[in-house]
C-alpha cells in the first residue's frame, strides 16, 4: 500500500514538474509567488461567474479589514505586471491554490480545492486580436502534448492527443448542434476532433443564452472578431476516454480593455464594480493590455495519468459516498 501511494505521488510530481518546465520555456514566462488572500473592497478578487461566495477570513492584527481566500489570480496578475513594469511579450506564472466552497457539484472533475498554473502576459503592440489568442492557445497546447509524450516515455501510457488543436466559435457550435445543451455540444465537437479551443464564452448566443457564465471584468467576451462572431476568450477542451466526455483543461483569454470593461459591466448590471480601486486603475490606463488564464493542475495530471477521479491526484474533501466509490482517493 505504501509503495503504491509513493508511486502515485511520484507520477503526480513528474507531470506537474514537467509541465511547469515546458510552460515557462515555451510561453516565455517567469514563475512568481502569489497570494492566497485578497482584501475585500479593492476589486482584486475573481468573481468567476458571479454566484460563488468566497471563504471570508479575519486577521487578528488587521482588525479594520476583511480578507477572502482567492478564487483565482486573474486580476492580481494584471496588477502585478503593471506594478513591476513588465514589458510587451513578458509574463508570469503562479502556482495558484484556491478554495471554491460553492462548487455546485463535487464529482469526478470538480473539487472544492483548486490548483492552477495561473499565467498572464503583456500583449505585444498591435496584437490584441483573435490571431494572437490562437497563437497563444497553440503554444499552450504544444506544452500539453510535450508533457503527454514525456509521460508516455516514462510510464508507458499511450499518447492520444492530436497534433493540432481545432478552433471553433460558440456561435458556430450552437448553429451546428441547435438541439443540444452547451455541455452536449462540447461533447459532440470534442469527440470528433480530440482537442478543441472553444472561442467566445460569456456573451449571449443566437439562441438567447450564453454558452457559459463569465465575470464581466477579466476576459473580453464581447469584442467582435470575424464573421460576426464575438469574444476573445475560450476554453481548451480534450476528449477524455476514461470519462467518455469532453474535459476542460484551461480557461483563458485576452483581458478587457477600458471599452470592453464598461460594455460588459453594463450588460451584466455590475457597474458598481467600477468604483473599486482595481477597476479605476484599468479605466485610468494604468494597466497593460494582457492575455492570461488558468490551467488546471489536478485536471492535467488526472487526464495525462488516465485517472477516473480528480481525488486520485489531489487531497481534498469529499462526501463519504465518493470515498466509498473510488479505491484510490487521496
Curated annotation (Swiss-Prot):
InterPro entries named among the record's database cross-references: aa-tRNA-synth_II, aa-tRNA-synth_II/BPL/LPL, AsnA
Cellular component terms per the entry's GO annotation: cytosol
SUPFAM superfamilies membership: Class II aaRS and biotin synthetases
Main location (coarse class): cytoplasm
Pathway: Amino-acid biosynthesis; L-asparagine biosynthesis; L-asparagine from L-aspartate (ammonia route): step 1/1
Reactions catalysed according to its record: L-aspartate + NH4(+) + ATP = L-asparagine + AMP + diphosphate + H(+)
UniProt entry keywords in alphabetical sequence: Amino-acid biosynthesis, Asparagine biosynthesis, ATP-binding, Cytoplasm, Ligase, Nucleotide-binding
Protein name: Aspartate--ammonia ligase
Organism of provenance: Streptococcus pyogenes serotype M2 (strain MGAS10270)
Amino acid at each position: 500500500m505504501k509503495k503504491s501511494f509513493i508511486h502515485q505521488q511520484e507520477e503526480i510530481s513528474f507531470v506537474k514538474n514537467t509541465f511547469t518546465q515546458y510552460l515557462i520555456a515555451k510561453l516565455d514566462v517567469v514563475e512568481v509567488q502569489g497570494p492566497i488572500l485578497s482584501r475585500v473592497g479593492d476589486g482584486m478578487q475573481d468573481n468567476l461567474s458571479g454566484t460563488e461566495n468566497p471563504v471570508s477570513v479575519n486577521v487578528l492584527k488587521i482588525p479594520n479589514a476583511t480578507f477572502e481566500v482567492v478564487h483565482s489570480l486573474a486580476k492580481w496578475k494584471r496588477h502585478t505586471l503593471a506594478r513591476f513594469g513588465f514589458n510587451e511579450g513578458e509574463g508570469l506564472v503562479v502556482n495558484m491554490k484556491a478554495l471554491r466552497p460553492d462548487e455546485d457539484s463535487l464529482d469526478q472533475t470538480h473539487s472544492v480545492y483548486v490548483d492552477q498554473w495561473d499565467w498572464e502576459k503583456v500583449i505585444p503592440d498591435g496584437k490584441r486580436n483573435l490571431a494572437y489568442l490562437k497563437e497563444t492557445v497553440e503554444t499552450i497546447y504544444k506544452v500539453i502534448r510535450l508533457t503527454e509524450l514525456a509521460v508516455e516515455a516514462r510510464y508507458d501510457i499511450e499518447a492520444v492527443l492530436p497534433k493540432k488543436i481545432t478552433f471553433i466559435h460558440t456561435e458556430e457550435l450552437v448553429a451546428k448542434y441547435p438541439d443540444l445543451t452547451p455541455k452536449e455540444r462540447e461533447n459532440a465537437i470534442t469527440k470528433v476532433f480530440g482537442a478543441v479551443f472553444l472561442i467566445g464564452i460569456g456573451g449571449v448566443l443566437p439562441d438567447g443564452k450564453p454558452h457559459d457564465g463569465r465575470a464581466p471584468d477579466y476576459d473580453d467576451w464581447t469584442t467582435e472578431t470575424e464573421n460576426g462572431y464575438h469574444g476573445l476568450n475560450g476554453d481548451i477542451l480534450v476528449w477524455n476516454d476514461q470519462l467518455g466526455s469532453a474535459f476542460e483543461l484551461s480557461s483563458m483569454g485576452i483581458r478587457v480593455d477600458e471599452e470592453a470593461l464598461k460594455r460588459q459591466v453594463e450588460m451584466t448590471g455590475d457597474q458598481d464594480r467600477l468604483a473599486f480601486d482595481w477597476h479605476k486603475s484599468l479605466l485610468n490606463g494604468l494597466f497593460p493590455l494582457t492575455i492570461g488564464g488558468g490551467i488546471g493542475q489536478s485536471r492535467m495530471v488526472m487526464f495525462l495519468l488516465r485517472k477516473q477521479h480528480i481525488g486520485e491526484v489531489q487531497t481534498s474533501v469529499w462526501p463519504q459516498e465518493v470515498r466509498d466509490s473510488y479505491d484510490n482517493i487521496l
